[in-house]
Amino acid sequence: MEQSDYGKFFITETPRHPDHPQSRDRDSDIPWCDTFYVSGGVNGQVPGAYYLETCMMLRTGSTPDLQVPHTHDFGEYLLFLGTDPDDHFDLHGEVELWVGDEKRTITRTTAVFVPAGVPHCPLVVHRVDRPFMFITTGDGTDYSREEDK
């Protein structure tokens, strides 16, 4: 392959998420199937790359780490994206998400911005009529969290 100044920025493979490595397996006990987990510049291969996780929601449920309210020292987007080409704003599912002490129900394509230091979660998937995308990203390079006390 030719040498390239920018080839390292095309990320096609990432390690599994350490908090729930089984989520890469389609038939795991996790409600989603992970595709990308970018943290720490993909083990230093892409310095400066922001934190990113992409998943496809396949079934109902939650994970222990998403049951606990937590904060980050970076701002984070939580994106819920419908996949119906006839109505891409219909999530075809229902997600319960807590931000601070507010419980919200998500049934439409939604972007939630969570400022640094704001507690969020639990996140519980109550209904999946059609798989939809769940993407999280933040303006930090390393994923870290602190459980809310």
What are these regions (language model features)?
Residues 1-67:
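A short, N-terminal "cap"/entry segment at the start of jelly-roll beta-barrel domains
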Residues 50, 75-77, 93, 130-131:
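Residues at beta-strand starts and edge strands
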Residues 102-126:
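Conserved metal-binding segment of the jelly-roll/cupin
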Residues 80-107, 145-147:
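A short beta-strand-loop-beta hairpin characteristic of the jelly-roll/cupin
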Residues 1-19, 123-149:
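Double-stranded beta-helix
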Residues 84-86, 119-121, 140-142:
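Short Gly/Pro-enriched loop/turn and capping motifs at secondary-structure junctions
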Residues 62-77, 85-92:
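A short beta-loop-beta micro-motif enriched in histidine and acidic residues
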